[in-house]
Amino acid sequence: MRLAVFSDVHSNHLALEACFQEAERQKADVWIFLGDYVSDCAYPHKTMELLYEAKKEHDCRFVKGNREEYILDHHKNGSDWNYQSTTGSLLYTYENMTADDLKFIDALPITDVIRLPGHDAIRICHGAPYKTRVLLEPGNGMAARVLHEVEEPVLLGGHSHKPFTERLENKLYVNPGSVGAQTCGVAQSEMAFLESDSKSWVPQLVRVPYDNAAVVREIEESGLLYKSSVWAPAIAKQLVTGENLALSCLLRAEKLAEGGAVTDTHLKQAARELGVLQERIHRYGYDYCDTQ
């Protein structure tokens, strides 16, 4: 029995296609999806179409992530999202999803349990079983804490974009990393496999190459690059460096704000300092320079 695990796609449909090919090559019996399917990259409906196709052809299990929660909250309650701002990328994502896409993500749970005959039960979630935005990272102690709280021997989660495994006594936590927006310095898609010939599961973390440059070109040709202020340019550069530039911009902007509200001006200054808005990356098809 072999399971394929995908998380944090972030609308990177080309990376997801590459991971699907790897899952098919390894003949995975069950495909598990841990949320954050959309936002950040262009054409979110293309990612949703891949999920629908996978659901038809394979035994798939899904939970929602925090990005799906953002989209659904905007859909149901409205928000002050605007283009040319820190929320422009989310607004682009929402406006490029269909009614069926919204219905699909709305129906997803935030946690589920996979029970396969003769094998240890597996709990799946995005961050933690009780909240999508709980951050489990290597060394921060949260994986052990959440493992202690769940009944199942295996817990699968994403959100941190950091692939790792952790054991607590007879329990196992696996984070497959990010399919679509890597942060560990290697610009290749990340996923995981779990394999078992008996009762217990053995994890394997995998990196899968994909056409990064094509994804960056899509961010530009779709108009997303110019609709989201700092965020989309940071993601575009992150896709070719594997470094968490979007988060770095936010953290630097918080310091510039000196305890006050972070404004778009702070974010743009942070992005310039980090080379996100000023660098021209011709060889990757990314040619964006802020002039304001």
Language model feature labels by segment:
Residues 111-114, 163-167, 190-194:
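Short beta-strand scaffold segments in enzyme catalytic cores
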Residues 23-27, 57, 116-118, 149-151, ...:
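Glycine-rich phosphate-binding loop signature in dinucleotide/nucleotide-binding domains
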Residues 143-153, 160-166, 171-176:
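Anionic-ligand binding region
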Residues 7-9, 35-38, 66-68, 127-128, ...:
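Active-site metal-binding loops of divalent metal-dependent hydrolases
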Residues 2-102:
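Core catalytic region of metal-dependent phosphoesterases/phosphodiesterases
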Residues 1-4, 113-123, 168-172, 200-202:
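Beta-strand-turn-beta hairpins that frame and shape the catalytic cleft
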Residues 170-176, 180-292:
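Acidic, His/Gly-rich catalytic cores of divalent-metal-dependent hydrolytic chemistry
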Residues 81-84, 119-150:
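Active-site-proximal segments of metal-dependent phosphoesterases and phosphodiesterases across multiple
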